[in-house]
UniProtKB/Swiss-Prot annotation:
Gene Ontology CC entries for this record: Cul3-RING ubiquitin ligase complex; cytoplasm; cytoskeleton; cytosol
Positions where Phosphothreonine occurs in the chain: 295, 375
Keyword S-adenosyl-L-methionine: no
Keywords, in A-Z order: Actin-binding, Cytoplasm, Cytoskeleton, Kelch repeat, Phosphoprotein, Repeat, Ubl conjugation pathway
GO BP of this protein: distal tubule morphogenesis; gene expression; monoatomic ion homeostasis; potassium ion homeostasis; proteasome-mediated ubiquitin-dependent protein catabolic process; protein catabolic process; protein K48-linked ubiquitination; protein polyubiquitination
Disulfide bonds: none
Organism: Rattus norvegicus
Protein family (similarity comment): Belongs to the KLHL3 family.
The protein's name in its UniProt record: Kelch-like protein 3
Renumbered residue ranges of the record's region Disordered: 1-24
Amino acid sequence: MEGESVKPSPQPTEQAGDGEKNRRMITVNPAHMGKAFKVMNELRSKRLLCDVMIVAEDVEVEAHRVVLAACSPYFCAMFTGDMSESKAKKIEIKDVDGQTLSKLIDYIYTAEIEVTEENVQVLLPAASLLQLMDVRQNCCDFLQSQLHPTNCLGIRAFADVHTCTDLLQQANAYAEQHFPEVMLGEEFLSLSLDQVCSLISSDKLTVSSEEKVFEAVISWINYEKETRLDHMAKLMEHVRLPLLPRDYLVQTVEEEALIKNNNTCKDFLIEAMKYHLLPLDQRLLIKNPRTKPRTPVSLPKVMIVVGGQAPKAIRSVECYDFEEGRWDQIAELPSRRCRAGVVFMAGHVYAVGGFNGSLRVRTVDVYDGVKDQWTSIASMQERRSTLGAAVLNDLLYAVGGFDGSTGLASVEAYSYKTNEWFFVAPMNTRRSSVGVGVVEGKLYAVGGYDGASRQCLSTVEQYNPATNEWIYVADMSTRRSGAGVGVLSGQLYATGGHDGPLVRKSVEVYDPGTNTWKQVADMNMCRRNAGVCAVNGLLYVVGGDDGSCNLASVEYYNPVTDKWTLLPTNMSTGRSYAGQWVSASGA
């Protein structure tokens, strides 16, 4: 064709015995089909050689039977079968609007089509009718890319009606993964009873607390209270009340009028109260749908390790992909930071306070995993390094720490909704190098260093946000400053730390139900100033130092076997005083 040269391979010299094989050559012109369709479309636009007119509503489109039949099994069956349309010059297509039909026939000739929010809901069923499966798939891909907490349930319903199996599964998974946002929308409130039950009964529902599920049920009932009131018991059957903190059961669930006025719901509440009275080992023996923790698949989880000392304060941030089993570098901190508190809240990672190599800071940086970038938000009221940080009831708590001259007993909280910090009740003891964790709606401050007495601490304090008070609970068996603290299965773990020059590898665990500590297996290595997080029923301890050098290794604890195992892959940088957290990738 004009403008194109197809270069044949050199003609091989015929050898004895080669015969016919060496007198033939096959060439392929990859542009031939595209050019042919371009010419056919030009002929169509000029109404040349057209032999059929396709009509929908008031739109008439002239075309070539052979082209339509070649690209659409629907038209192929129509034109090659015994139906009257096989010979008709004018064919009407019902259940498709004229503009959509025109776009799809354009696609047959050009292989181009624009999918938009405005046309996708008519384009997909029309493509399905004409059996243009690549267009149908493009529509599904577009809808999948548009999934949002405000529309995922509508897209799920649309996919169900049109038998788009993959899209249906993707939309359902999205709704489960983003349930705290989905439950606030009009689509959730408009679901049928069976649809709500199906959603909230899923083990894969991703919620930070069962409180969200309870709140969703109350919201759905109240949206059309008169017609939905009788459904309360059926819905509460799927709310895992035993997994809620005792304070929440007493102060919120028991006081809810919809619960008070329903005997079956009161029975569910009593079941939860009795569950909380049992020792932990007996709770584990109770097996029913309401005592089973949810196991959300969510998005692939990553462990993010932020800054640290290596040996000076660094900006480096690494993330570990649990599915791939590898470490990757992600966006660096805006400035060097070690000895910070790090938490995951509202879909973002927060790095709070710390030490920049010369000064203790009160600044806070937030990481957006979608954009892979850090931004700064409101600073704390006080400078803090070696602080503890945790999230409780949608507030970020900064606990204790060191301001450059003295250890701190003060505690402040941050609301991401108002971007403001405010003080809450101080601890009873100044604590720097303190570990913190949240269990059953209470905040715990574990060990640390009291600058006044110059001693490492074995004491532990508990904060109740409802009363704004700190009280002492049972001491650890040993003094620990710089202990890594994490929460697993409703228990508080204190790992490693040091008492003076002695760096520990011992680990003890606190049961709030009995107010007691017990020893579990030692770690493989002595560690202080390490990060700790829980993932899929395992407790991970990241980095730290052993008293002589910073560590790049990571080990995890399995409570079922009471064993620690070293992760096969180390971080790229040995670091202590790093903060780390686990989030969903892309969060």
